[in-house]
Amino acid sequence: MKAIKDDNIRFLVNWTLLSTILIPLGAILGYFVGLSVSAAFGYGYNGGEPPFVSTVVYCCWGTVMTTIISFIQWRMLSKKIKLSYLWIPLCVLGFIVGESIVGILLWKLDIQRGDLGWAQGGSILAEALIFAFSGTLIGLFQYTLLRKSYYKAEMWILVSTIAWGLIPLVIFIFGGLTLGAITGISLIWIFKLKTK
């Protein structure tokens, strides 16, 4: 019993530490990819680009960030549970679909997505809501993998929503710590509810 507890603590510490490092790293690398994509369309990264370009930029930025974090998550989870590599594209897809839906809504409302970003001086609450929406989709998509083996795996949707939504509120460095702690604790709890 002590070995299981020690293994869970080790998992939680590693999961949280890696999230703390990788969320900001992914955000920084994604920023440069987004900047390059914006420049390829003939714009800077300070807003002002058309809604389509803005949506593409944020999707590219998010793709880099979610690919990095979900790859490491998958590697760690695969050591504890049987988990498909689809964990990675489902995370990326959730973020892209979320940003695309937000991009379309903002375009219809004549609001520039780039103006909402906290790094551009926009509302951190708006950024948190956008991240929470994408987190909901990420959780929903990843739930399809967890539900096959774990009772109450639907909690992952709520956990993902909260964890991703908190990232902008506590800035990305501490957002990674927050995401890692919340999702790590939740996964340990979900693992205890194995159905098969």
Q: PLM ranges: what are they?
A:
Residues 1-196:
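Juxtamembrane/disordered regions of integral membrane proteins
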